[in-house]
Amino acid sequence: GPANLVTAARTAKQFLTFVNGGPFQPATAVGLRLPDSYFEGLRVGLQATRDRLCDVLTDIGFTVFTPEASYFATVDIRPIDPSGDGYEFCRRLPAKAGVVAVPNEVFYARPHYGRHMVRFAYCKQMHVINAAADALVKGFAS
């Protein structure tokens, strides 16, 4: 196959060798046959849900780090929660706004570096993002 695709698949494979990657092989084959328009549709859809979520988070008052490529938008909670405790913020968030976030500190070797950051997923359908946006606005209206 094309050298760039083989290299990419081989690189991914080296990080998957600790699990059985059998199910990924047919999925990869199908994906390689999909038209570019499929991936363009994914890009456009993810950009729209990202922008909607990031706009709402910004309007609420978070410092938002809008990603160029990801499924997650990271925010600094300190403008909203001066304690900067992302873990506790994420524990309270479902009761406050009916949505969840993940504290970024769990991804750090030195958790205190990410303590004030949390991430929200935007890899959802737009109606789900809209419902979450409404819930966040309502939850932080006070």
Language-model regions: role of each:
Residues G1-S142:
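PLP-dependent class I/II
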